[in-house]
Amino acid sequence: MTEKQGQSGHMPIVSSSHLASNEAMTLSEFEYALTMMNNAFQRWMQSCSTTSGMSELSPLDILVVHNIYHRNRPKRIADVAFTLNIDDLHTVSYSVRKLAKLELVTSVRQGKDTFYNITPNGEAFCNHYRDVREQCLVEALKTMNINDQLGDVATLMRTLSGFYDQASRAVRSL
Protein backbone atom coordinates (compact mmCIF):
# COMPACT_ATOMS: atom_id res chain seq x y z
CA MET A 1 0.00 0.00 0.00
CA THR A 2 1.45 3.35 -1.03
CA GLU A 3 1.24 6.45 1.07
CA LYS A 4 -1.50 7.89 -1.19
CA GLN A 5 -3.67 4.79 -1.03
CA GLY A 6 -6.46 4.83 1.50
CA GLN A 7 -6.95 2.28 4.28
CA SER A 8 -9.01 0.13 1.92
CA GLY A 9 -5.99 -0.15 -0.38
CA HIS A 10 -7.49 1.73 -3.32
CA MET A 11 -6.01 4.83 -4.91
CA PRO A 12 -8.34 7.77 -4.16
CA ILE A 13 -9.62 9.70 -7.18
CA VAL A 14 -10.14 13.39 -6.47
CA SER A 15 -10.59 16.50 -8.60
CA SER A 16 -8.86 18.98 -6.28
CA SER A 17 -5.70 17.56 -4.72
CA HIS A 18 -5.16 20.72 -2.67
CA LEU A 19 -8.35 19.86 -0.73
CA ALA A 20 -7.37 16.22 -0.23
CA SER A 21 -5.28 16.35 2.94
CA ASN A 22 -4.75 13.10 4.82
CA GLU A 23 -7.76 13.83 7.03
CA ALA A 24 -9.95 14.94 4.12
CA MET A 25 -8.94 12.41 1.44
CA THR A 26 -12.05 10.26 1.75
CA LEU A 27 -14.29 13.32 1.84
CA SER A 28 -12.55 14.72 -1.27
CA GLU A 29 -13.03 11.41 -3.02
CA PHE A 30 -16.73 11.37 -2.06
CA GLU A 31 -17.22 14.96 -3.24
CA TYR A 32 -15.64 14.20 -6.60
CA ALA A 33 -17.84 11.12 -7.01
CA LEU A 34 -20.85 13.22 -5.99
CA THR A 35 -19.94 15.84 -8.61
CA MET A 36 -19.62 13.16 -11.28
CA MET A 37 -22.90 11.57 -10.17
CA ASN A 38 -24.71 14.92 -10.15
CA ASN A 39 -23.53 15.78 -13.65
CA ALA A 40 -24.39 12.31 -14.97
CA PHE A 41 -27.81 12.47 -13.27
CA GLN A 42 -28.57 15.87 -14.81
CA ARG A 43 -27.47 14.63 -18.24
CA TRP A 44 -29.68 11.56 -17.78
CA MET A 45 -32.70 13.65 -16.75
CA GLN A 46 -32.36 15.86 -19.83
CA SER A 47 -31.92 12.86 -22.14
CA CYS A 48 -34.96 11.16 -20.65
CA SER A 49 -36.95 14.40 -20.89
CA THR A 50 -35.97 14.86 -24.54
CA THR A 51 -37.02 11.29 -25.33
CA SER A 52 -40.29 12.03 -23.51
CA GLY A 53 -40.96 15.01 -25.78
CA MET A 54 -39.67 17.93 -23.70
CA SER A 55 -36.17 18.88 -24.85
CA GLU A 56 -36.56 22.43 -23.54
CA LEU A 57 -36.61 21.44 -19.86
CA SER A 58 -33.61 22.02 -17.59
CA PRO A 59 -32.76 19.55 -14.83
CA LEU A 60 -34.44 21.87 -12.32
CA ASP A 61 -37.59 22.07 -14.46
CA ILE A 62 -37.72 18.27 -14.56
CA LEU A 63 -37.36 17.98 -10.78
CA VAL A 64 -40.02 20.64 -10.25
CA VAL A 65 -42.62 19.13 -12.60
CA HIS A 66 -42.18 15.70 -11.02
CA ASN A 67 -42.44 17.22 -7.54
CA ILE A 68 -45.65 19.04 -8.44
CA TYR A 69 -47.07 15.77 -9.80
CA HIS A 70 -45.96 13.87 -6.65
CA ARG A 71 -49.05 12.49 -4.88
CA ASN A 72 -51.16 14.64 -7.21
CA ARG A 73 -51.57 17.37 -4.57
CA PRO A 74 -51.39 21.13 -5.19
CA LYS A 75 -48.13 22.71 -4.05
CA ARG A 76 -46.82 26.20 -3.42
CA ILE A 77 -43.47 27.27 -4.79
CA ALA A 78 -42.11 27.36 -1.22
CA ASP A 79 -43.23 23.75 -0.70
CA VAL A 80 -41.44 22.60 -3.85
CA ALA A 81 -38.27 24.50 -2.92
CA PHE A 82 -38.32 23.09 0.62
CA THR A 83 -38.82 19.51 -0.56
CA LEU A 84 -35.98 19.81 -3.08
CA ASN A 85 -33.75 21.60 -0.53
CA ILE A 86 -33.43 24.72 -2.71
CA ASP A 87 -32.80 28.05 -0.95
CA ASP A 88 -33.32 30.31 -3.96
CA LEU A 89 -37.09 30.52 -4.43
CA HIS A 90 -36.52 32.66 -7.52
CA THR A 91 -35.11 29.72 -9.49
CA VAL A 92 -38.09 27.54 -8.58
CA SER A 93 -40.49 30.37 -9.39
CA TYR A 94 -38.87 30.85 -12.80
CA SER A 95 -39.09 27.11 -13.44
CA VAL A 96 -42.78 26.99 -12.48
CA ARG A 97 -43.55 29.92 -14.80
CA LYS A 98 -41.76 28.10 -17.61
CA LEU A 99 -43.70 24.90 -16.89
CA ALA A 100 -46.96 26.88 -16.89
CA LYS A 101 -46.11 28.40 -20.30
CA LEU A 102 -45.49 24.88 -21.59
CA GLU A 103 -48.89 23.88 -20.13
CA LEU A 104 -47.38 21.22 -17.87
CA VAL A 105 -48.64 22.87 -14.67
CA THR A 106 -51.42 25.29 -13.85
CA SER A 107 -51.94 27.69 -10.96
CA VAL A 108 -54.87 28.20 -8.66
CA ARG A 109 -55.24 30.95 -6.04
CA GLN A 110 -56.43 30.00 -2.57
CA GLY A 111 -56.59 33.06 -0.36
CA LYS A 112 -53.17 34.72 -0.40
CA ASP A 113 -51.39 31.63 -1.73
CA THR A 114 -50.89 30.32 -5.24
CA PHE A 115 -50.86 26.57 -5.62
CA TYR A 116 -49.68 24.63 -8.63
CA ASN A 117 -51.17 21.46 -10.05
CA ILE A 118 -50.11 19.16 -12.82
CA THR A 119 -52.08 19.44 -16.07
CA PRO A 120 -53.09 16.50 -18.26
CA ASN A 121 -50.11 17.39 -20.51
CA GLY A 122 -47.82 17.43 -17.48
CA GLU A 123 -49.18 14.12 -16.26
CA ALA A 124 -48.64 12.56 -19.71
CA PHE A 125 -45.06 13.86 -19.76
CA CYS A 126 -44.29 12.56 -16.25
CA ASN A 127 -45.77 9.15 -17.04
CA HIS A 128 -43.86 8.88 -20.32
CA TYR A 129 -40.67 9.94 -18.49
CA ARG A 130 -41.36 7.18 -15.93
CA ASP A 131 -41.80 4.59 -18.70
CA VAL A 132 -38.56 5.62 -20.42
CA ARG A 133 -36.77 5.63 -17.04
CA GLU A 134 -37.97 2.13 -16.25
CA GLN A 135 -37.02 0.84 -19.70
CA CYS A 136 -33.54 2.38 -19.85
CA LEU A 137 -32.34 2.87 -16.28
CA VAL A 138 -34.31 0.63 -13.94
CA GLU A 139 -33.84 -2.42 -16.16
CA ALA A 140 -30.09 -1.77 -16.41
CA LEU A 141 -29.78 -1.36 -12.63
CA LYS A 142 -31.70 -4.60 -12.01
CA THR A 143 -28.79 -6.53 -13.48
CA MET A 144 -26.51 -5.16 -10.76
CA ASN A 145 -28.81 -6.36 -7.95
CA ILE A 146 -28.11 -3.29 -5.79
CA ASN A 147 -31.62 -2.17 -4.81
CA ASP A 148 -31.06 -2.54 -1.06
CA GLN A 149 -27.67 -0.84 -1.29
CA LEU A 150 -29.20 2.09 -3.20
CA GLY A 151 -31.66 2.59 -0.35
CA ASP A 152 -28.80 2.65 2.15
CA VAL A 153 -26.82 5.09 -0.02
CA ALA A 154 -29.89 7.35 -0.29
CA THR A 155 -30.27 7.39 3.50
CA LEU A 156 -26.59 8.18 3.93
CA MET A 157 -26.74 10.98 1.35
CA ARG A 158 -29.77 12.59 3.06
CA THR A 159 -27.87 12.43 6.36
CA LEU A 160 -24.76 13.95 4.78
CA SER A 161 -26.87 16.77 3.31
CA GLY A 162 -27.67 17.73 6.90
CA PHE A 163 -23.96 17.90 7.74
CA TYR A 164 -23.31 20.07 4.68
CA ASP A 165 -26.25 22.34 5.63
CA GLN A 166 -24.88 22.72 9.17
CA ALA A 167 -21.34 23.36 7.90
CA SER A 168 -22.78 25.97 5.53
CA ARG A 169 -24.38 27.77 8.47
CA ALA A 170 -21.19 27.48 10.55
CA VAL A 171 -18.91 28.85 7.83
CA ARG A 172 -21.03 32.00 7.59
CA SER A 173 -20.12 32.86 11.17
CA LEU A 174 -16.35 32.69 10.56
Model-assigned labels for residue ranges:
Residues M1-E23, N147-L174:
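C-terminal regulatory/oligomerization modules of transcriptional regulators
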Residues M1-S55:
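N-terminal leader segment of winged-helix/HTH proteins
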Residues M37, F41, Y129-M144, L156-A170:
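Alpha-helical linker/hinge and terminal dimerization helices associated
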Residues Q46-D87:
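N-terminal helix-turn-helix DNA-binding core of bacterial DNA-binding proteins
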Residues M54-S58, S93, K98, N117, ...:
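Short glycine/proline-centered loop/turn elements that form peptide/ligand docking sites
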Residues P74-T114:
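Canonical helix-turn-helix DNA-binding module
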Residues R97-G151:
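Charged, amphipathic alpha-helical coiled-coil/dimerization segments
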